[in-house]
């Protein structure tokens, strides 16, 4: 199963009890996967999904939340599109559902972005809207240089609305047009993990992070193989190990970290191959390498103490045999 399929399978199983969140998810799914059609003078809603479980989830929600009947039509894959597609269609009361979900405004005009009730919703409903958009037209690529979480959008207004929703969750995303198709893209690895966690794809996050770390370690090992100087190899491995420990320290401490230690830790994470002296030069104001080392040491000590108090794995637990082979 691909990463995208795994994420959608997990998201389609997320239990949501809050009615407003279920409405936000349905609205977003219909907006990003669907369309309004006029057939024999009646408005018909269709939403095309690539996962059968997502189609069933949408059908159940339409029935339970709005009381409307829908059908699922299976469209077999062809030369251009491999794999089956699942079309959820609402024929009877299509106009009523379109108004209820915000696809049509009070004057009966199609809404081009996201419905107002979704745009101004609570954080929980905003998360639900993102989940619906991803189930509709989302994808996740393997960790690497071009790794990204993307959602294909029906238009620029919907893309900007989704970017705004991500911003409300503290996640940076970008709207861009590629070959005439509007997309919302998240490229930062930590941001990808954050949005997946928010949406409820916890198992997928673990799998993605494992592949991401494996790739980083492999990439570092490849670079180390080209080093002629043994001391340089040891320094680089030590820097990678320190970066891994700092990342674990931030997970343990969460918000409870003094600013000057946060800054030192971020410098280490953002410059994994840099020496302590180089990190000191990158600091504002500049620091000596001993000052940088001292701050990172205090950060790790704080995290290890808290981990010991809580009975959870400390910063050294994240180290792999490759990192320890100094």
Curated annotation (Swiss-Prot):
HAMAP family hit by this protein: HTH_type_WhiA
InterPro entries linked: Homing_endonucl (IPR027434), Sporu_reg_WhiA_N_dom (IPR018478), Sporulation_regulator_WhiA (IPR003802), Sporulation_regulator_WhiA_C (IPR023054), WhiA_LAGLIDADG_dom (IPR039518)
Species the sequence originates in: Beutenbergia cavernae (strain ATCC BAA-8 / DSM 12333 / CCUG 43141 / JCM 11478 / NBRC 16432 / NCIMB 13614 / HKI 0122)
Gene encoding the protein: whiA
DNA-binding region, residue intervals: 275-308
Protein name as catalogued: Probable cell division protein WhiA
Its job: Involved in cell division and chromosome segregation.
Classification via Pfam families: HTH_WhiA, LAGLIDADG_WhiA, WhiA_N
Single biological process term from Gene Ontology: regulation of sporulation
């Amino acid at each position: 199963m691909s990463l995208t399929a795994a994420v959608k399978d997990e998201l389609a199983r997320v239990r949501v009890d809050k009615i407003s969140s279920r409405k936000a998810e349905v609205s977003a799914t219909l907006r990003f996967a669907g369309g309004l059609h006029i057939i024999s003078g009646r408005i018909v809603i269709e939403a095309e999904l690539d996962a059968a479980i997502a189609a069933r989830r949408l059908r159940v929600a339409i029935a339970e939340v709005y009381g409307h009947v829908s059908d699922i039509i299976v469209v077999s894959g062809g030369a251009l599109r491999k794999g089956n597609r699942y079309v959820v269609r609402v024929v009877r009361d299509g106009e009523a559902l379109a108004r209820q979900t915000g696809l049509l405004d009070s004057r009966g005009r199609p809404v081009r972005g996201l419905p107002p009730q979704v745009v101004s919703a609570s954080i929980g409903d905003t998360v639900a809207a993102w989940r619906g958009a991803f189930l509709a037209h989302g994808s996740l690529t393997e960790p690497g240089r071009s790794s990204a979480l993307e959602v294909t959008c029906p238009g620029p207004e919907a893309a900007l609305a989704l970017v705004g929703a991500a911003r409300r969750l503290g996640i940076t995303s970008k709207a861009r047009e590629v070959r005439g198709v509007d997309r919302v893209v998240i490229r930062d690895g930590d941001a990808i993990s954050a949005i997946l966690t928010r949406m409820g794809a916890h198992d997928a996050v673990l799998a993605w992070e494992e592949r991401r770390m494996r790739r980083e370690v492999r990439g570092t090992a490849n670079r180390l193989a080209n080093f002629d100087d043994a001391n340089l190899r040891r320094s680089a491995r030590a820097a990678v190990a320190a970066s891994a420990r700092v990342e674990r320290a931030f997970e343990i401490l969460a918000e409870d970290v003094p600013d000057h230690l946060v800054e030192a830790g971020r410098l280490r994470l953002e410059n994994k191959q840099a020496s302590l002296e180089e990190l000191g030069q990158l600091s504002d104001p500049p620091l000596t390498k001993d000052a940088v080392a001292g701050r990172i040491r205090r950060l790790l000590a704080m995290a290890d103490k808290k981990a010991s108090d809580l009975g959870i794995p400390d910063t050294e637990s994240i180290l792999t045999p490759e990192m320890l082979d100094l």
